[in-house]
Amino acid sequence: MRMMKNNNNETVTVIGIDHGYGNMKTATRCFPSGVARYDKEPIFQNNLLVYNGMYYQIGEEHKEFCAEKTQDEDYYVLTLAAIAKELDGKGMNRAKVHIAAGLPLTWVATQKEDFQKYLLQNERVDFTFRNKEYHVEFAGADIYPQGFAATFYRLQDFKGINMLADIGNGTMNIMYINNSRPLEKKCFTEKYGTHQCVLAVRESLLKELGTVVDDLVIEQVIRTGTADIGEKYLTVIRKAAGDYTKEIFHKLREREYNPELRRLYVVGGGSCMIQNFGEYDKSRVTIVRDICATAKGYEAMTVRKIQRNGGMLV
């Protein structure tokens, strides 16, 4: 979150938000991108958001994959929660907010305008989150290519020919960056993320051991490489995750990845799969484990845009 004065001398709060299928991320916060809607006030209210007369439990479960993030109200409600978390971190509950967000690389051209309108559907909004009232006015919304934003602070490192893989919960975005310049015609989006890995592991457990294991356990092994479970279960999960990670590298090779000819940069929450289960030359592959890197990049790009238009940080 960055406080700025725009060229009209208005104070605006820039908040970068990464609308993931698995997690919502801001520059300083990360929470599951699940929404459960209730007509009446629910019993448990730890992450309750009240908006427009409805009750929403935030972070109950992951958001299912959808080709368009504007197809329901979930991401709007999650956006309000993300804004509230950032404002609360600064002891604020009122602001004029400029959203910096993004979409998968190959979706930006066709969905950018609709997503921008979706985020700005209200000029101002009053809502309650975790028993605290918020009053937000919207100053604007910028939409950037997902993945590329995560490299914003380190573009100078992209000398020569490079491939960027942004592995999220629902998609993997692939981009070529040559001599610090992204190649627009070399951008691809694959439906190949950590959620699909969980499904593959779940199927292996059922096939090999006839057992259903909670997704939270599977996700922990994917994220950390281990969990407090029996060795036979751990072995099957690791094997399935390793096989899935090999498929990720196969997808990259289909997009002309050759480790001897280009460096690979891996970002996003799914980068843990590469780190924990991948077979690769560590001198040729860089893994960026900051799950908030993309949100930070969105935020930084909007700050730069406002500065170029005569604004300044305050």
Ranges and model annotations:
Residues 202-208:
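Acidic, metal/cofactor-coordinating or nucleic-acid-engaging core segments within structured domains
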Residues 1-164, 181-196, 208, 216-314:
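Nucleotide/phosphate-binding catalytic cleft detector across ATP-hydrolyzing
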Residues 26, 174-176:
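Conserved blade-register residue in beta-propeller folds
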Residues 167-173:
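Ser/Thr-glycine-rich phosphate-binding loops at phosphate-binding pockets of nucleotides
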